[in-house]
């Protein structure tokens, strides 16, 4: 299988290097001989840099990691920073179901525009782009969703942001003649993050018994280290074109996850019972009250309707075969 040349002396620019996926990409690249130039929003904030520096120390290659400061909403800084790198891995975004919706959408779209433009100006020909199965969708029920499928729901700012920004990336890649490879991970679990993402931040509530019954919402899962490896392999393998869904553990629901937690950790208070669909309106109401009390909201009425229109039957066959 033809691959890219030896990683020695190649430098990969990683945006959002401190994020859940980003920091694991940095570690994987360092472990595989690459130089890494990673961007964070505030380079003076140790919480955004210390774990990256530790990765380089663990691998014994501190000299191969360079950290720079950059906000993806700033259009003017990126081309100069990326110039001289061999590829761009664009992971930076706001992954949240609770922050300002328009900010989430604007950050995704503007970040994509700024970074793809910078890649063109810097002469980078191959870009690896982090999207999500949120851009693939969970409909129709009963059929395995593949890379040919696109999200049709507009049920949350995050779903809108990931779908519209990936479409924008493909449009720009065609216009700029950039070889774009897109990774579409499902819910990403596994350690190695500073702040929990929506994929994992409900686990403490599950383990501590704050969720007495779990909603039967569709769920597919992938480990963050597999996501990191997939990004690197998408860059290295010449034939690795297009989109790549990462959902090796699929056809699950949140109830299945809770039962697995209970089986692995019998002393936890994880629920084993699922909430009947007929009671989901009460879940939405309870979630709304939590929002009034300043707690995170997980399930609006619109989000719940979107969940139940589809399932988590999502195929990772292409990624398994190619990457």
Question: Model-predicted segments: where are they?
Answer:
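N-terminal Rossmann NAD(P)H-binding glycine-rich loop of SDR-like oxidoreductase domains
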Residues: 10-34
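NAD(P)H-binding glycine-rich loop region in Rossmannoid oxidoreductase-like domains
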Residues: 44-47, 54-110
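Active-site Tyr-X1-5-Lys
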Residues: 155-180
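Glycine/proline-rich active-site loop of Rossmann-fold NAD(P)-dependent oxidoreductases
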Residues: 175-178, 190-202, 234-244, 267-269
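Mid/C-terminal beta-alpha module of Rossmann-like enzyme folds, strongest
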Residues: 230-299, 316, 321
């Amino acid at each position: 299988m033809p691959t890219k040349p030896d990683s020695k002396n190649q430098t990969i620019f990683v945006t959002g290097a401190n994020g859940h996926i980003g920091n694991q990409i940095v570690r994987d690249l360092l472990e595989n001989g690459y130089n890494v130039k990673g961007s964070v929003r505030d380079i003076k904030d140790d919480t955004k840099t210390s774990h990256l520096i530790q990765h380089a120390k663990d691998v014994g290659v501190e000299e191969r990691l360079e950290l720079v400061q950059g906000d993806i909403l700033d259009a003017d800084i990126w081309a100069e920073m990326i110039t001289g790198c061999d590829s761009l891995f664009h992971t930076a975004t706001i992954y949240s179901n609770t922050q300002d919706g328009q900010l989430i959408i604007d950050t995704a779209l503007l970040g994509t525009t700024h970074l793809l433009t910078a890649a063109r100006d810097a002469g980078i020909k191959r870009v690896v782009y982090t999207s999500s199965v949120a851009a693939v969708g969970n409909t129709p029920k009963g059929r395995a969703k593949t890379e040919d499928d696109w999200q049709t729901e507009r049920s949350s700012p995050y779903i809108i942001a990931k779908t519209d920004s990936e479409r924008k990336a493909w449009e720009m890649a065609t216009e700029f003649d950039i070889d774009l490879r897109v990774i579409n991970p499902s819910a990403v679990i596994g350690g190695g993050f500073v702040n929990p993402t929506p994929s994992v931040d409900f686990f403490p509530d599950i383990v501590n018994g704050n969720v007495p019954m779990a909603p039967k919402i569709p769920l597919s899962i992938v480990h963050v280290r597999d996501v990191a490896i997939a990004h690197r392999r998408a860059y290295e393998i010449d034939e690795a074109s297009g989109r790549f869904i990462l959902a090796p553990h699929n056809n699950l629901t949140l109830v299945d996850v809770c039962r697995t937690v209970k089986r692995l950790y019998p002393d936890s208070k994880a629920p084993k019972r699922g909430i009947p669909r007929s009671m989901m309106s009460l879940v939405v109401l309870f979630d709304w009250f939590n929002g009034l009390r300043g707690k995170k909201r997980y399930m609006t009425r619109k989000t719940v309707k979107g969940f139940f229109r589809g399932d988590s039957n999502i195929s990772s066959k292409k990624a398994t075969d190619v990457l």
